Amino acid sequence: RVDRSTPWSLMASPIVISALDSIKVRKGVWEAIKDKPWMWYLEARMGAEVFQLHAVNGDDRDWYDQMLASQDDSLIPDEPCTAKATIYTACIAAGQIGKTVRQIVTGEKPPRLLIHDIVKGVITQIGG
């Protein structure tokens, strides 16, 4: 469990990656790390067949802070557990996260938000 009391030395990395199940927990992790000296924060979200990846540059944190503050678990439809555990979506998500890490380490700027709708076969990229 990561919160404000978690020593930064246990989390310290230039790239922090999270994949959490609720907005409440995402907000807790964000509060624990937002003022720390990381370079990138990658926050992954997955539904049955849709994957989202927020890529937060350490020099541009305000947009994510504002976006996350406006979200609440009660506003997000709950999917049945079996719909959340779609292995091919998780595999695609892992590949997209790996690609984003490669972009960062090779000096490319990844999109702020990547949404991959697997059913429709559509990848939407915002910012970057």
Which residues does each PLM region occupy?
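Conserved SAM/SAH-binding loop
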Residues: 1-7
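Glycine-rich phosphate/adenylate-binding loop
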Residues: 8-128
